[in-house]
């Protein structure tokens, strides 16, 4: 890009890829909260528990693997509608001198290395902040969505 622009931010407090993610789109809104689990089987077990306890509809995306973080992921909605990511297998970011890795927005593998593309809700829905009116983004969004 001739003029690099910030499209998303992943923030962490404990050296993993992220705990909170903010992305471009109508907002400001919280996209999701990330919760690290020990391994891939914990993510699969969460799918089994949700499906067998009447919460299958809470599954929004996944399981799959992200290109950016290499994380094995599952996204679900909590009872209040907030998006939660269960993930594992990401890399550590403990070194403050670590050079950020740049990804092109038109690279579909940055979002999903393998697995189904994100649903439209992934780009159009988020948790609003109290007292802050969401507005259209300054940078247009052209998401790759599941059909």
Language model features with spans:
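Core segments of cupin and vicinal oxygen chelate
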Residues: 1-17
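Short beta-strand micro-motifs in enzyme catalytic cores
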Residues: 7-9, 31, 70-74
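Short glycine-biased active-site loop of nucleotidyltransferases that positions the nucleotide triphosphate
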Residues: 12, 23, 75
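Short, charged/polar, Gly/Pro-enriched secondary-structure boundary elements
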Residues: 17-20, 82
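Solvent-exposed, charged amphipathic helical/linker segments at domain boundaries
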Residues: 19-22, 30
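A short secondary-structure junction signal
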Residues: 21-24, 45-46
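Long C-terminal interaction/binding lobes of large macromolecular proteins
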Residues: 27
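Vicinal oxygen chelate
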Residues: 35-84, 88-147
């Amino acid at each position: 890009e001739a003029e690099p622009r910030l499209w998303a931010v992943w923030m962490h407090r404990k050296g993993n890829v992220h705990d909170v993610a903010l992305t471009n789109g109508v907002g400001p809104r919280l996209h999701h909260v990330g919760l690290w689990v020990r391994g891939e089987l914990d993510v699969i077990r969460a799918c089994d528990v949700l499906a067998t306890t009447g919460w299958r509809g809470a599954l929004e995306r996944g399981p799959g693997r992200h290109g950016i973080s290499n994380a094995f992921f599952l996204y679900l909605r909590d009872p209040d509608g907030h998006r939660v990511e269960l993930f594992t297998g990401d890399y550590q970011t403990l070194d403050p001198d670590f050079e950020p890795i740049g990804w092109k927005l038109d690279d579909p593998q940055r979002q999903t290395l393998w697995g189904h593309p994100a649903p439209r809700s992934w780009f159009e829905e988020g948790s609003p902040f109290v007292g802050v009116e969401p507005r259209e983004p300054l940078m247009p969004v052209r998401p790759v969505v599941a059909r």
